[in-house]
A protein has these predicted regions:
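Charged, glycine/proline-rich intrinsically disordered loops and linkers
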Residues: 75-113
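Radical SAM [4Fe-4S] cluster-binding motif and immediate context
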Residues: 190-346, 350, 370
Length: 439
């Protein structure tokens, strides 16, 4: 029977918007999930997996056959630390908006011929689910949609993910048949990581959304409601990936330590009991330093958290307000002191510092960098990316209206130093040099 008739959504016609609920109504379909290649000046595998797509494929597999093509994973080119992979790349022509940017531009992923050969080996799908992440990575999304259309002309292509949620009208122009509007909590208890076979690392979200409302962050747009998963749910997600061989787990949470007495400490106790140090844990998204007292720091160390990222953003009071006032100077100093006492080295206490925000004084960035050094941490520059729908995007777009129509201009690698005119490339390099000067 025609699956498109049965779902009452997947019918012929111009690009239309659908929801996750529409996709979950699929029955008897051959479904292919695709994570596109990345096109950008730089890309690093910080335990990067298309988690939303993997949750969806897990939900669909009970009533459909599912397969996965992860173009980033297919381009793995050697192991780095803690299960991460180097990603193969080749230089490509820069798109017109980047013509003045004096940097090389790359395709991170297999070449066209390699992906085409991989797709040719697959059974033709009925529905292809293409995910997306950064808004300024849409050229890789467009590229893979065109290739998929060429190889599987009869398949219906559905575009979802972060970019599609933040820029739905722009996403509707990339050639997909349908665009997923909005986000929803996963219907599956864990992601379909087994589609990779054996894995070196796993990923986990113990909560969805964030209780804070930072002016630069899209978490509240993507997840309007903050919800903490149960301890049993979080453990089941980690267990299923450890069973596939993962010895490293990266937490994607925006607020992992919130409510630590009720959730985080019990989670750590149970992981130690189950794995006895057999799992290494990582927090690439940054921890709220206000929560890191002596007990918390000791728990992190005892539970084998290897990658600690701290969220400071700025010691400038104006910038701190845009960060929901998550941290004060004394709280940061105390957090680093507690981590050092628990056995962490300075290089283990990398601290995110924002640079390039609308109206931000470069002197405040320098002051924050020096403050981190003076208190025993290691500064890590986080260049501002104007994300559609956030208050600071609106502030940036008033100065650069083209941000509203061209997502490439939202790229954090080049926005603040080439497009915002708030900071020059030379000044940005000076800030980067300051973050390395004491190592």
């Amino acid at each position: 029977m025609n699956i498109y008739v049965r779902t009452n959504k997947f019918t012929a016609g111009p690009p239309a918007f659908v929801t996750q609920e529409d996709l979950l109504a699929l029955r008897g379909a051959r479904v292919l999930g695709v994570n596109p290649p990345v096109r950008d000046f730089a890309f690093m595998d910080l335990w990067s997996k298309p988690l939303g797509l993997l949750y969806l494929l897990q939900s669909l597999r009970a009533e459909n056959s599912v397969a996965l093509l992860d173009c980033v994973w297919e381009a793995r080119a050697g192991l780095k630390t803690y299960g991460r992979q180097k990603t193969a790349k080749h230089e490509i022509e820069k798109p017109a908006p980047y013509a003045a940017v004096r940097r090389r531009y790359f395709h991170f992923g297999p070449a066209r011929e390699e992906i085409a050969a991989k797709l040719a080996e697959m059974e033709a799908p009925d529905v292809i689910l293409v995910t997306s992440v950064m808004t300024y990575w849409y050229l890789g999304v467009k590229w893979i949609i065109e290739l998929l259309r060429e190889i599987f002309p009869a398949a219906k292509i559905v575009l979802g993910g972060v970019y599609a949620s933040l820029c739905p009208k722009h996403a509707a122009r990339l050639g997909a048949d349908y665009v997923v509007r909005g986000r929803a909590e996963p219907a599956a208890p864990y992601p379909a990581m087994d589609l990779y076979g054996a894995i070196d690392y796993g990923v986990s979200m113990t909560s969805f959304g964030c209780p804070f409302s930072c002016g630069y962050c899209a978490s509240g747009i993507l997840w309007p409601r903050y919800r903490r998963r149960s301890l049993a749910e979080a453990l089941a997600e980690i267990d299923c990936q450890a069973a596939l061989g993962a010895r490293d787990i990266a937490f994607y949470d925006d607020a992992l330590l919130l409510g630590k007495e009720e959730f985080f400490y019990p989670l750590c106790r149970e992981l130690r009991a189950r794995y006895g140090g057999g799992l290494r844990l990582h927090t690439p998204n940054g921890l709220h330093v206000r929560q890191i007292d002596e007990r918390c720091a000791q728990t992190l160390a005892e539970s084998d958290f290897k990658t600690i990222r701290l969220s400071l953003e700025s010691i400038d009071p104006e910038i701190a307000r845009e960060s929901s006032g998550k941290v004060a100077r004394g709280e940061y100093a105390a957090a680093v002191k507690n981590l050092r006492a628990a056995g962490y080295a300075p290089e283990d206490c990398e601290t995110y510092i924002l640079a390039g925000l609308p109206g931000q004084d470069i002197r405040s960035v320098k002051d924050t960098i020096n403050f981190v050094w003076d208190n025993g941490g290691v500064p890590k520059l986080a260049e501002f990316s104007p994300i559609p729908g956030t208050p600071l995007f609106e502030a940036a777009a008033r100065k650069l209206p083209a941000l509203r129509s061209e997502p490439l201009l939202q790229n954090n690698s080049v926005y603040c130093s080439y497009f915002s005119h708030d900071i020059t490339p030379a000044e940005l390099q000076e800030l980067k040099d300051m973050t390395k000067r004491r190592l």
